Design a protein with these regions (language model features):
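Intrinsic disorder/low-complexity segments
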Residues: 133-172
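Beta1/beta-strand and adjacent pyrophosphate-binding region of the FAD-binding site
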Residues: 4-15
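Conserved acidic residues
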Residues: 8, 176, 189
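Conserved N-terminal/central alpha/beta ligand/cofactor-binding core
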Residues: 5, 23-127, 182, 194-214, ...
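N-terminal Rossmann-fold NAD(P) dinucleotide-binding loop
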Residues: 18
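Conserved beta-strand-loop-beta-strand element in the redox core of flavoprotein oxidoreductases
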Residues: 129-132, 171-184
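Short hydrophobic core segments
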Residues: 187-195
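Conserved phosphate-binding elements of NTP-dependent enzyme cores
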Residues: 11, 21-22
Length: 278
């Protein structure tokens, strides 16, 4: 093991959430490190390269209002804009943009790499290091630990094992660092896990399956077990990707062209007009 520089915050994962988390911390003056498997994959849009849609479009504007970057990134990488549900009332209308995903990722990487207080590291976090804090977990009037104060305790009718002996004794756990796949120990006061679909990931192609993150990228193995040891419960979600087809096998004459809107509403409140990528 080799010790790395210490940080206030370690953000694990360079997708949309990791970008916003690392930028927010760094802009508040916290010494931050963004740890990602590949610098080239920061902000990578995996499947349908779009931002916004029902509910999600509102969230993007809320992120922008809080100082986030997603709205500005999509405004600068947009290739088509549509306001969904224009025939219905304003309550269900939602902005959505298709992005040039190469440009989006490139812009996101540039912002990350040029932000003060923010460092990047190509590696994979596989373990979270904690110690018992000197701050006790909250107790109720009878002196028992309050419901919900321990990760993994009984809740909503389901029973899970307590986290660690320290939790059983009523002591909080506090983050002291993370461990990476390449044997680095990175001391930090807080860790933000934005791992997306990579934790213990598997890919299924027909009857074939194998450990994987995205196609051609490694999954993350070890971090799930680390969280389980701390008392967190984990589950598995599934995402499906439509098959890719060869362009020359498609008869585009049978398709109906769907134009974008001429009136474009920027996602960012800072933008008055849209600069499309060349």
């Amino acid at each position: 093991m080799a010790f790395y520089d210490s940080f206030d915050v370690a953000v694990c994962g360079g997708g949309h959430a990791g970008i916003e988390a690392s930028l927010a911390c760094a802009r508040m003056g916290l010494k931050t490190i963004l740890i990602t498997q590949s610098i080239d994959s920061i902000g990578r849009m995996s499947c349908n390269p779009s931002i916004g849609g029902i509910a999600k479009g509102n969230i993007v504007r809320e992120i922008d209002a809080l100082g986030g970057e997603m709205g500005r990134l999509i405004d600068r990488s947009m290739i088509q804009f549509r306001m969904l549900n224009k025939s219905r009332g304003p309550a269900v209308q939602a902005p959505r943009s298709q992005a040039d995903k190469i440009v989006y990722s490139s812009l996101a990487r540039h912002v990350v790499e040029t932000t003060e207080n923010l460092s990047t590291l190509m590696d994979t976090v596989v373990d979270v290091l904690t110690v018992a804090s000197d701050v006790p977990l909250p107790k109720d009037s009878s002196g028992s630990l309050e419901s919900g104060s321990i990760p993994g305790e009984k809740r909503s009718g389901s029973s899970y094992a307590f986290a660690t002996q320290a939790c059983r004794s009523g002591m909080r756990q506090k983050i002291i660092g993370v461990v990476t796949e390449r044997g680095r120990i990175i001391p930090c006061r807080a860790a933000v896990l934005t791992t997306g679909t990579f934790l213990g990931g598997r890919i299924f192609i027909g009857e074939y399956d194998a450990p994987c993150g995205r196609l051609g990228e490694s999954g993350v193995f070890g971090l799930t077990e680390s969280l389980s040891r701390l008392g967190f419960t984990t589950g598995r979600l599934k995402t499906g990707t439509p098959p890719r087809i060869l362009k020359h096998t498609v008869d585009f004459s049978r398709f109906e062209l769907q134009e974008g809107d001429k009136k474009i509403l920027p996602f960012s409140f800072d933008d008055e007009k849209i600069e499309r990528p060349m």
